[in-house]
């Protein structure tokens, strides 16, 4: 079991291309496909103003970005050792180890999708997979690309299975 905690301080979630009620399932599929089952992830849905403020305060960078990733650990965490299979194990009231926190700007997501000529939902899944890869300890490169592809494909499978 995995858990996603969603915060929407800017009331921007309505602009997501994936319904808020479906985001947890998307993350669960991504985590299962990439060996990160059994962790909690925090997701903050932001606008450009909020993500720009966090970007400057936390990273010293000026301006908005698409997604920020804040791993809970200095190194990739160990998988919870008990041989759990995806979708089994702890119930919703059990404490799970925190993998990390993500901040997604809906404004930048939509702007980039338009500029890149991509479907907004596809770009959203790509950004969420990218952020998940960073909090799992991956940096840019071939391993990150493989991680992102596995996560994105799993998320797409859950979206088309409905």
From Swiss-Prot:
Disulfide bond positions: none
Enzyme class, broadest EC rank: hydrolase
Cofactors (names): Zn(2+)
Keyword annotations: Cytoplasm, Endonuclease, Hydrolase, Metal-binding, Nuclease, Ribosome biogenesis, rRNA processing, Zinc
GO MF annotation: an example: metalloendopeptidase activity
Binding-site residues for Zn(2+), renumbered to this chain: 130, 134, 140
Note on cofactor: Binds 1 zinc ion.
CC annotations in GO: cytoplasm
Name of the protein in question: Endoribonuclease YbeY
Annotated source species: Nitratidesulfovibrio vulgaris (strain ATCC 29579 / DSM 644 / CCUG 34227 / NCIMB 8303 / VKM B-1760 / Hildenborough) (Desulfovibrio vulgaris)
Gene for this chain: ybeY
């Amino acid at each position: 079991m995995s858990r996603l905690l969603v915060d929407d301080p800017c009331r921007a979630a309505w602009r997501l291309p994936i319904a808020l009620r479906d985001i947890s399932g998307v993350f669960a599929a991504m985590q299962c496909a990439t060996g990160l089952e059994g962790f909690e992830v925090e997701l903050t849905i932001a606008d450009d103003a909020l993500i720009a403020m966090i970007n400057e305060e936390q990273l010293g960078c000026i301006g908005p970005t698409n997604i920020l990733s804040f791993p809970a650990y200095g190194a990739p965490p160990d998988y919870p050792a008990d041989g759990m299979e995806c979708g089994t194990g702890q119930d919703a009231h059990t404490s799970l180890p925190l993998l990390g926190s993500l901040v997604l700007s809906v404004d930048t997501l939509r702007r980039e999708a338009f500029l890149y000529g991509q479907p907004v939902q596809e770009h959203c899944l790509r950004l969420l997979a990218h952020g998940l890869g960073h909090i799992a300890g991956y940096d840019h490169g071939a391993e990150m690309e493989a991680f992102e592809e596995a996560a994105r494909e799993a998320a797409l499978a859950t979206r088309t299975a409905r």
